[in-house]
Amino acid sequence: MMASERNQSSTPTFILLGFSEYPEIQVPLFLVFLFVYTVTVVGNLGMIIIIRLNSKLHTIMCFFLSHLSLTDFCFSTVVTPKLLENLVVEYRTISFSGCIMQFCFACIFGVTETFMLAAMAYDRFVAVCKPLLYTTIMSQKLCALLVAGSYTWGIVCSLILTYFLLDLSFCESTFINNFICDHSVIVSASYSDPYISQRLCFIIAIFNEVSSLIIILTSYMLIFTTIMKMRSASGRQKTFSTCASHLTAITIFHGTILFLYCVPNPKTSSLIVTVASVFYTVAIPMLNPLIYSLRNKDINNMFEKLVVTKLIYH
């Protein structure tokens, strides 16, 4: 009998410890996370709606941005509601199937965002370094392929890692020292040998980070070279400002994900990993629409119009 069959027959249950060691701050944390999740939902769905409604925003960059917002919304929705529930209930349990599903979908959207940001970096490279060929290179077909490829690779990575998690064995009741069903804490809760699953996760994480960062760093090295060749200071500043939002987003995202998923032994610093997980899963999906909208006048103007219209008719 395979381990996955034993798991299904014994129906293991995971107990998410999360912030159970700090009961005095659970209510404040609930309110904070509820506010953050509300901002995340409104910000990302609002971004998608605004881009669809405003014809001025039917650009290639906004096409990628709308999919980035969709990815952030889906990722946050997979994780945050369960986190909020566990802050107010006495028994912080999640079924084995529920835990695996949470990891599976979180992995899909996490990997998708990694390569979506890389595709956006390539878009900025073409816009700055090859402006006359921009519409030719960044064709509708190529943009669709870049987005579809990001989603597809996210699904492939998730299915591989999920398959090997299903091959592990767990006790009927297992404690997980985190607030989400992350790969590292799931394998640490298994009593079977997780070596293959751990190595695969490490290899996939390294491959995803290195390959996406190569695209991003190469793109921005060429962008900076082009900017420095410009004679006009105002031209350099204007060109750089078009990349500032994306630079901020990738710095926050990749800095956090490198720390979380490229550390061979996260057990040695579980508290730090938990804090970083909170930032990665809760804060980043909220920050992305704020980062991009603050520097885009068309998005700001459209948002103001929607708010004014809402206030007038309600």
Swiss-Prot record:
Belongs to the G-protein coupled receptor 1 family. GO terms for molecular function: G protein-coupled receptor activity; odorant binding; olfactory receptor activity. Keywords: Cell membrane, G-protein coupled receptor, Glycoprotein, Membrane, Olfaction, Receptor, Sensory transduction, Transducer, Transmembrane, Transmembrane helix. One of its GO terms (cellular component) is plasma membrane. The keyword Membrane applies. The chain crosses the membrane at residues 28-48, 57-77, 102-122, 142-162, 199-219, 240-260, 274-294. It is found in: Cell membrane. Its main location: membrane. One of its GO terms (biological process) is G protein-coupled receptor signaling pathway. Odorant receptor. This is Olfactory receptor 5D13. Residues 1-27, 78-101, 163-198, 261-273 are extracellular. The keyword Cell membrane applies.
